[in-house]
A protein has these predicted regions:
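Catalytic machinery of carbohydrate-active enzymes
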Residues: 1-342
Length: 342
């Protein structure tokens, strides 16, 4: 029996997508050795959309909590599955405990919180010049080295939904087949600084509706984004459907996979849409578009690159959020129009 390999998932949806090239590299290296993932429940649907993954083991572990009893429970479960290697993607000591407790021989990851002993094939990152996320994770497929592959040298992150699953999930949402579909993702888990203003999303929706009156516009996000999306829907009217907090992540995957174009802040949904290879426009303000750009074949990154950005702050420290506010709806439409026309 071929020994299995295990990936310990990050807590963030976008980070899980950025780790997909690592999965492709591991599968190419040994296609007969199954790859499993230990993932939080809210991230698990992303891993299930990766063809190279064999089994996704869901955990109730909460972000920032030690929950030592739960970690020991999962370690015992993993010990029985016979893993030869574990790739620990989060940088915290807590996640490195699990494969160590499970007795997995090779434990690969970054130094993180001084995880000496818990990680025994240790990689190091330059915090002064952090790598692009896909390069950061993909480096774990090889022996530790000072150099790393540029994103252009790596496989692109890719997710796949089979047609039956996609149609079933779409039926559950009430989204109609055969009509032009544009998805907006106005939320941002990281913080309010990353959000394009609701007024701007509403202006863009009006422009889209005037140009394509037959199109459906859907607003996607988590329950935390519902009120933000409701503000947009209230400004636009019934042609916009607020699905934030209503859909499961798997249903959101199906909607994104069926969209003719996606406009999103720098969020997990942007990276899902990109990995599904949909035409996407990513709106970047306080974050660096070169650190985690979209990788779909048709993609546009919009960033004003003001002198104060990327500040990487959750809330604008200058109180004006000009990096997002000065990004006008017409500017976004100029890119979106070409995507919809083609």
């Amino acid at each position: 029996m071929t020994a299995r390999r295990l990936i310990i998932s990050p807590n963030w949806i976008g980070d899980a997508v950025m780790a997909q090239p690592l999965v492709q590299l591991l599968h190419k290296e040994d296609p007969h050795s199954p790859i499993d993932v230990l993932a939080p429940t809210w991230v698990a649907p992303v891993w299930r959309a990766m063809r190279e993954i064999d089994t996704v083991i869901e955990t109730p572990l909460k972000h920032g909590k030690l929950q030592l009893g739960h970690r020991w429970k999962f370690a015992r479960q993993l010990r029985q599955r016979g893993y030869r290697a574990a790739y620990v993607l989060p940088n915290t000591l807590k996640f490195a405990l699990i494969p160590w407790l499970a007795g997995i021989t090779h434990r690969i990851g970054y130094k993180g919180e001084s995880r000496y002993g818990l990680i025994n094939r240790m990689h190091h990152d330059d915090r002064a010049a952090p790598r692009p996320m896909v390069s950061f994770y993909a480096a774990l497929a090889h022996a530790p080295a000072h150099h790393f592959a540029h994103p252009d040298q790596l496989p692109k992150p890719r997710l796949h939904l089979d047609e039956e699953r996609r149609k079933k999930a779409l039926d559950e949402t009430g989204v109609q087949f055969g009509k032009p579909l544009i998805a907006f993702a106005p939320g941002a888990e990281f913080g309010s600084a990353k959000r394009w203003p609701t007024t701007h999303f509403a202006q863009l929706a009006h422009i889209v509706r005037d140009a394509y009156p037959e199109a459906d516009i859907v607003l996607l996000g988590s329950a935390k984004d519902h009120d933000v999306c409701e503000e947009i829907a209230a400004q636009v009217g019934p042609k916009v459907k607020n699905m934030a907090g209503v859909t499961t992540l798997e249903q959101a995957l199906a909607v994104l996979a069926s969209s003719d174009a996606v406009v999103s802040n720098d969020s997990g949904l942007l990276h899902i849409a990109s990995a599904l290879n949909r035409p996407v426009i990513g709106l970047y303000g306080p974050t660096d578009p070169d650190h985690a750009p979209p990788f779909s074949d048709v993609a546009k990154t919009i960033s004003l690159r003001l002198s104060c950005s990327p500040c990487k702050k959750r809330i604008c420290p200058l109180k004006h959020q000009n990096c997002m506010r000065q990004m006008e709806a017409q500017m976004v439409w100029d890119s979106l129009r070409g995507m919809l026309a083609s």
